[in-house]
């Protein structure tokens, strides 16, 4: 009898063509769909399929709501294969009887591949799974400010529940071409080398790339801390709400970062989204989308946000892990073929909206970690091609004490110069080119001692400018402080100051300006440009001060 039933189901499977199978699945009753599916899985999971066949032999009907529920065929490595759930959507949340949640990633003819958000040890074979009907959505709004949440929007800082009035889908489509506007407002990071040479605009995507331990997070964190000077005011147009997404980092690192933000009074305007190293790969994959979703709320309400993805290498690794376990075909470096789309659909959500769409903006600072300075690897080249420029940090410079360790030659901002303040553009226009020339000359100068006067002067000034661009961590500067300093360096007023005393000169000069010449800084702030009169005054003040400093 059992053999006859098996023969019947074999005939039924043979009768379906490739197209007929889909039509039968949609049109025929649930039982025939089960017939077509179960035999396909017979080799993979004989126990579960034979139990389904046994039910059919005994004349037991499958439960009528098979479209809404399913049964676990196999589970392991954070992946569950589920039979049933015919109507499930891609990336829909499902709930297992054990309470574990998962997300449907692979929708196949006979089964659904589900990635688990919790431990797979809690899920058993044969367990029932039910649809929730929800695609991953997260709470958004100003209520999140000052909080730490996980990839699904649940609070993890022990400060109680978050009462958000609105929820949004984590993976929304990026805005089209028409609602956008070109970048025209600056994001001040407070770092001399960034604001002068690789300026960032609101709505831009600027990549921070470098080896491990080169200060990538420090650059992003300084940018957050520098927003305090505007965010403590009431002008909504100048405020920049910050979202920091930690992917695959140690919990101790995230805790230290939150502590730093709290100590510097920056947590008031910041939101931290954390999917740490100990969490499941699907959560590390989702966290950047959650961060982008939170930032988009401000963008779409005419406000401005800055989202830091730290780092997207770990997101790509988590996505690779999920894809390989779901048996999707691997490509270069074993990443799936759509890993480029993973990052492009995320970073395209950063935009400057035009006036009719509220004029808000979302700026993205993705972080990528390289191996041994290799920027030609798969993920680094992908993200470099998606973003509007990159800040390249070099371990060699970092160990020499040049911090932030920005390689001027390889760092570029493709759209930020349009947003740079006029005063900064006036003084720093030639700075990047000069420093790139200096690095080139310095490399050759090691070979020969016979150098002409012009080369010696380039080396002399280059050393001082490099020293001037050094900056301590967590001490961002205002633009009206940077402009006089860079003006002094570029115009050769520091050529006579010993290199070892440059940072001392900087501290003393800023103190002198604040005490004795506050109107210079006030004028730079107010006008945003350097007039002929102001330039003459600056020259006079710098020369007088440098004489007394050296005297």
Swiss-Prot record:
GO terms for molecular function: ADP binding; ATP binding; proton-transporting ATP synthase activity, rotational mechanism. It is found in: Mitochondrion; Mitochondrion inner membrane. Keywords: ATP synthesis, ATP-binding, CF(1), Hydrogen ion transport, Ion transport, Membrane, Mitochondrion, Mitochondrion inner membrane, Nucleotide-binding, Transit peptide, Transport. It holds the Pfam family ATP-synt_ab_C. PROSITE patterns: ATPASE_ALPHA_BETA. GO terms for cellular component: mitochondrial inner membrane; proton-transporting ATP synthase complex. It comes from the Eukaryota. One of its GO terms (biological process) is proton motive force-driven ATP synthesis. ATP binds at residues 210-217. The record marks 411 as: Required for activity. Mitochondrial membrane ATP synthase (F(1)F(0) ATP synthase or Complex V) produces ATP from ADP in the presence of a proton gradient across the membrane which is generated by electron transport complexes of the respiratory chain. F-type ATPases consist of two structural domains, F(1) - containing the extramembraneous catalytic core, and F(0) - containing the membrane proton channel, linked together by a central stalk and a peripheral stalk. During catalysis, ATP synthesis in the catalytic domain of F(1) is coupled via a rotary mechanism of the central stalk subunits to proton translocation. F-type ATPases have 2 components, CF(1) - the catalytic core - and CF(0) - the membrane proton channel. CF(1) has five subunits: alpha(3), beta(3), gamma(1), delta(1), epsilon(1). CF(0) has three main subunits: a, b and c. Belongs to the ATPase alpha/beta chains family. This is ATP synthase subunit alpha, mitochondrial. It comes from Neurospora crassa (strain ATCC 24698 / 74-OR23-1A / CBS 708.71 / DSM 1257 / FGSC 987). The lineage of its organism: Eukaryota, Fungi, Dikarya, Ascomycota, Pezizomycotina. The gene is atp-1.
């Amino acid at each position: 009898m059992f053999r006859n039933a098996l023969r019947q189901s074999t005939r039924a499977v043979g009768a379906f063509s490739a197209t007929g199978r889909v039509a039968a699945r949609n049109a025929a009753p649930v039982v025939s769909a089960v017939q077509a599916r179960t035999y396909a899985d017979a080799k993979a999971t004989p126990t579960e399929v034979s139990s389904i066949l046994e039910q059919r032999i005994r004349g037991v009907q499958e439960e009528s709501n098979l479209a809404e529920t399913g049964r676990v065929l196999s589970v392991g490595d954070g992946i569950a294969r589920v039979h049933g759930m015919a109507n499930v959507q891609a990336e829909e949340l499902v709930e297992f009887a054990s309470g574990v949640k998962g997300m449907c990633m692979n929708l196949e003819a006979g089964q659904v591949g589900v990635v688990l958000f919790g431990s797979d040890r809690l899920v058993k074979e044969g367990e029932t799974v039910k649809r929730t009907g929800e695609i991953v959505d997260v709470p958004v709004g100003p209520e999140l400010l000052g909080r730490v949440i996980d990839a699904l929007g649940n609070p993890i800082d022990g400060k109680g529940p978050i009462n958000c009035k609105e929820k949004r889908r984590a993976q929304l489509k990026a805005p089209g071409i028409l609602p956008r506007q070109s970048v025209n407002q600056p994001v001040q990071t407070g770092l001399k080398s960034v604001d002068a040479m690789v300026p960032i605009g609101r709505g831009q995507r600027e990549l921070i790339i470098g080896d491990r331990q080169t200060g990538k997070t420090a650059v992003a964190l300084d940018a957050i801390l520098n927003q305090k000077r505007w965010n403590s005011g009431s002008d909504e147009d100048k405020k920049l709400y910050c979202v920091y997404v930690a992917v695959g980092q140690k919990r101790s690192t995230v805790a230290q970062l939150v502590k730093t933000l709290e100590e510097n009074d920056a947590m008031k305007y910041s939101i931290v989204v954390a999917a740490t190293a100990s969490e499941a790969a699907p959560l590390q994959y989702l966290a950047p989308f959650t961060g982008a979703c939170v930032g988009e709320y401000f963008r779409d309400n005419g406000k401005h946000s800055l989202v830091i993805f730290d780092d997207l290498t770990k997101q790509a690794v988590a996505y690779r892990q999920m894809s390989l376990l779901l048996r999707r075909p691997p490509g270069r470096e074993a990443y799936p073929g759509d890993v480029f789309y993973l990052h492009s659909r995320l970073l395209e959500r950063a935009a400057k909206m035009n006036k009719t769409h509220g004029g808000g903006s979302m700026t993205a600072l993705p972080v990528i970690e390289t191996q041994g300075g290799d920027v030609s690897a798969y993920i680094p080249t992908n993200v470099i091609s998606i973003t509007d420029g990159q800040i390249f940090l070099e371990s060699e410079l970092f160990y020499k004490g040049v911090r932030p360790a920005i390689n001027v030659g390889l760092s570029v901002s493709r759209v930020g110069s349009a947003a740079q303040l006029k005063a900064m553009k006036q003084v720093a226009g030639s700075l990047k080119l000069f420093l790139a020339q200096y690095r080139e000359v310095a490399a050759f100068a090691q070979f020969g001692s016979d150098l002409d006067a012009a080369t010696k002067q380039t080396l002399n000034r280059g050393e001082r400018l490099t020293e001037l661009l050094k900056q301590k961590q967590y001490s961002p500067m205002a633009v009206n402080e940077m402009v006089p300093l860079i003006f002094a360096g570029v115009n050769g007023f520091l050529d006579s100051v010993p290199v070892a005393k440059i940072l001392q000169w900087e501290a003393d000069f800023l103190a002198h300006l604040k005490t004795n010449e506050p109107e210079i800084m006030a004028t730079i702030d107010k006008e945003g440009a350097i007039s002929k009169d102001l330039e003459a005054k600056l020259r006079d003040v710098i020369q007088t001060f440098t004489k007394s400093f050296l005297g």
